[in-house]
């Protein structure tokens, strides 16, 4: 697209540039290498503001003004716990997850650092939500002692939050470690896969199904020790009995097993997901890929595995045999975790060759990890750049849903508002919308969050908004985005700027070292931006697209 359409699209961009509004005060959550933290920054994140800290003292009225929990919320853990601040000194924010924020904390009695995931009780809307948190803590304790599972230190509860203190994984994300090594071989991939599948086997032997295995849920406790790989985030994990089947669709699109999409699955789904991770470790790309989320699901159900494209012609037959058996679309014929560990390719001192993989594989892994960051930053820029005229319809919709005129939409208001607009979403799907839109984990959706969420659904591909986002990154107005300009934007958003060269290289189709407008549009409209816990965006889009006042 950079060659064929770049000129005309760049002209459109330049013609729009003078009228494209933009703001530079958008905010982002710092990411760090710790439990519940998706990425490691290139530099330490700034210390969290005291006013934003979940364990800072604040009056109930102030908490309510911020949309936090009222002081009289019932107990989640079901028993009294010590005061977290009596035991730990709280530090900087490490990461922002979908259901909680992770902070660095230091045990006062020992000086040992830990990670503390703080979950807002306002997000625990139903009895099921409360049970989910209890179960996550129970499962972490149940798996305690496994060397490759993050260790839980304790769980605490106050008026506003549930806090889970756990082992600090300061060594970074799995993919980041692979990239840093430089030399990367099938044998190294086999070692890493052996650890990952070992965790799966341990979970299954203890009656636990993880249900959300993915590379970002494996972190290193020590950056110098590959064997310190730890599985984190058991928020979607469940206990199961032999023969028991599950029907709720959870997980992430690239990694979800076909039987999960068909709503009839068991622990075999974890083995499928581990097979997807192995495919990515060896090639740098997911095995089931499409331009849309629905396309990804269709590819998963079709089950075709590409072993013809590079680098697969030089990958060993034994590796491909293992992947084929892990990605068997028939769960009962799929290898168990124990059988995977017995496969010749993966066994210690097995047949996996030690010759280096094509460097392009490392590059693909970097791109796969980095691209979504830029898209999400651009999405926030677009949301902040909308004119008052353009968001009038969405503003009206927001005001209609905000029944008490508080400036924030609660779960009940969202549910009732969507019903008025003809939505047939289930309660769990509405809860998913809350999770996706509630950026600051306040338990409510404020005006900017609402605009960003609805923009994500039905306005991303509007050209004038793409122009506004491009204009934000194109600091000098040259019509091109450079690495330096992306670094500046990342600094403004407090985002890590590692691997921006790879973002440029993937989007730069005419190889001139920069991104023109046509290439930017291609990047923004290609593929899937990532969905968290469950998928409901398409049905919501249908409901809202025809609603009164929808844009």
From Swiss-Prot:
What residue spans carry the region label Autoinhibitory domain?
352-382
- Inducers of expression: By cold and salt stresses. Induced by N-acetylchitooligosaccharide elicitor. Induced by UV-C.
Activity regulation (UniProt):
Activated by calcium. Autophosphorylation may play an important role in the regulation of the kinase activity.
The record's catalysed reaction(s) read: L-seryl-[protein] + ATP = O-phospho-L-seryl-[protein] + ADP + H(+); L-threonyl-[protein] + ATP = O-phospho-L-threonyl-[protein] + ADP + H(+)
**Record: residues binding Ca(2+) 4:** 508, 510, 512, 514, 519
Q: Name one GO cellular component term.
A: membrane
- Enzyme Commission code: 2.7.11.1
The positions flagged as active site in the entry are 212 (proton acceptor)
Q: Where is the Protein kinase domain?
A: 88-346
Main role? May play a role in signal transduction pathways that involve calcium as a second messenger. May function in signal transduction pathways that positively regulate responses to cold, salt and drought stresses.
Misc. comment: Plants over-expressing CPK13 display enhanced tolerance to cold, drought and salt stresses.
Official protein name in the record:
Calcium-dependent protein kinase 13
Which source organism does the UniProt entry give? Oryza sativa subsp. japonica
- Gene that produces this protein: CPK13
